[in-house]
UniProtKB/Swiss-Prot annotation:
Record function comment: Functions in the N-end rule pathway of protein degradation where it conjugates Leu, Phe and, less efficiently, Met from aminoacyl-tRNAs to the N-termini of proteins containing an N-terminal arginine or lysine.
Protein name, as recorded: Leucyl/phenylalanyl-tRNA--protein transferase
Enzymatic class: transferase
Alphabetical UniProt keywords: Acyltransferase, Cytoplasm, Transferase
GO terms of molecular function: leucyl-tRNA--protein transferase activity
């Protein structure tokens, strides 16, 4: 296994099976963040992740963190909060503000560089990247964004400025995504937050098999049209 230097003149990637074991999943470096290359990456289970000042790094970790949306873990406290929630949730209303919120909400710094923001804005303009917004009155208090691959959604980042705002974004999105034919959410790398919401780890080979099948399955017509999302209260 060796780290591959990508060419700016080809958008091809090496097989994810050749990724390094340490650091886990590092596959390649270089290239660019053009829409064509980003889409090629997601179609093959690869994503960019690098710090400011570093070269572009491409990853495909093993195991892979995923969330089956119908298995979202709704804790008792979150259920009580949601039933009396002051929030309103929308889809694709404010992509620029969501990615900006994700980039600027971490005190310890962020991997979402200006180049990353611009690249995913282009993907959004092309209909491939999407945002979920959480509002309190007219204030954006949380949200998440990611890239669609048919019935699979590749979650990229989320942020929260008020209590349970990012959890609300994922909860409502999971319900709506499932109702319209969505099958799986890619969480990339497991962490305590996503694990508490139901994310699990599966072998990379299994993830790649799911991706190959699900990216061919379309969601219900016009699913990504900007609109308000609702979840029945129980």
């Amino acid at each position: 296994m060796r780290l591959v230097q990508l060419s700016r003149h080809s958008i091809a990637f090496p097989s994810p099976e050749g990724a390094l074991r340490e650091p886990n999943g590092l596959l390649a470096l270089g290239g660019d963040l053009s829409p064509a290359r980003l889409l090629m990456a997601y179609q093959h289970g690869i994503f960019p992740w690098f710090s400011p000042g570093d070269p572009i790094l491409w990853w495909s970790p093993d195991p892979r963190a995923v969330l089956w949306p119908e298995k979202f873990h709704l804790s008792r406290s979150m259920k009580r909060f949601h039933n009396a929630s002051p929030y309103r949730v929308t889809l694709n209303y404010a992509f620029d503000r969501v990615i900006d919120g994700c980039a600027n909400h971490r005190d310890e710094g962020t991997w979402i560089t200006r180049g990353i923001e611009e690249a995913y804005r282009r993907l959004h303009e092309l209909g491939h990247a999407h945002s979920i917004e959480v509002w309190r009155d007219q204030e954006l208090v949380g949200g998440m964004y990611g890239v669609s691959q048919g019935a699979l959604f590749c979650g990229e980042s989320m942020f929260s400025r008020q209590e349970n705002a990012s959890k609300t974004a994922l909860l409502v999105f999971c319900a709506e995504f499932t109702r319209h034919g969505g099958k799986l959410i890619d969480c990339q790398v497991i962490n305590s937050h996503t694990a508490s919401l139901g994310a699990i780890e599966i072998p990379r080979r299994d993830y790649l098999d799911h991706l190959a099948a699900l990216r061919q399955q379309p969601l219900a017509s016009r699913f990504w049209v900007p609109r308000t999302l609702f979840l029945p209260r129980k």
